[in-house]
Amino acid sequence: MKSIWFHFQGYRDLPDDFTEKYDSVWVTPPNDVLCDPEMAGKYFNWNLEELEYADEMGFDGLGVNEHHSNAYGFSCSPNLVAMPLARRKSQAAIVVLGATLPLYNPAIRVAEEFALLDCVSGGRLVAGFPVGSAMDTVGVYGTPPTMVRPRYYEAHDLITQAWTRPGPFAFNGEYNKLRYVNPWPKPLQTPHPPIWLAGGGSIETWKFATDNNYTYNYLSFTGYQNSRALMQGYW
């Protein structure tokens, strides 16, 4: 068994009466009132130090993720957090769970940044491809709900082709129309870094994981017993 130190990177100084005053920690908590930029900078540095300490303690992987307008996980760009971890002399995997694919237009940006992380880390990247929460994709970035899955599948195809096909080549999708797909560099790992799918139990995501032989990561917010029952359905 392997252990990953996953850091949600929450804002650590919400008021005691937060739940009485505000509806949610996601999308709507007012940034002028609740988020001190100076403290946010300190928190990010503390978060990196904690991840580095987990590396020193021998964890098999260091996990980061992406959320937006979110007080309990305010890392809006996981690759920025992953890069200083990637350059450390370490055996720990850099587990980015992940880049919310429907938000990237064009999605070649994910292919480029993940490839660079893989090269800098010496081939330690685990590439997470979550569909994303409705709060991120619809609430913050304004993606129409009916387009979230189609954008996700097309982004997946573009990224994996960019990693495995000789460039340059053209990609003519519905949402990504690129005359030249030719990322410099391609990933160090061949044919590409391991791809993990993080999800909350959607059968569509399960099927996509099994169809492509990807690792599935269940995001448990309801405790062990509920998670165990749900995952038995997957297995």
Residue ranges and their predicted role:
Residues 1-2, 58-61, 89-94, 120-125, ...:
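Short, well-ordered coil/turn segments that N-cap beta-strands
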Residues 150-187, 191-198, 208:
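Extended catalytic-interface subdomain
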Residues 1-88, 193:
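N-terminal beta1-alpha1-beta2 module of alpha/beta enzyme domains
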Residues 42-53, 113, 199-207:
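Short, acidic/polar
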Residues 201-235:
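A conserved active-site cap/scaffold subdomain adjacent to cofactor or substrate pockets
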Residues 2-40, 103-170, 216-218, 222-226:
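Flexible, glycine-rich active-site loops centered on histidine and acidic residues
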Residues 50, 81-85, 110-114, 155, ...:
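A general structural detector for well-ordered alpha-helical segments in enzyme core domains, enriched
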Residues 52-56, 82-91, 114, 118-125, ...:
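Acidic (Asp/Glu)-rich catalytic clusters
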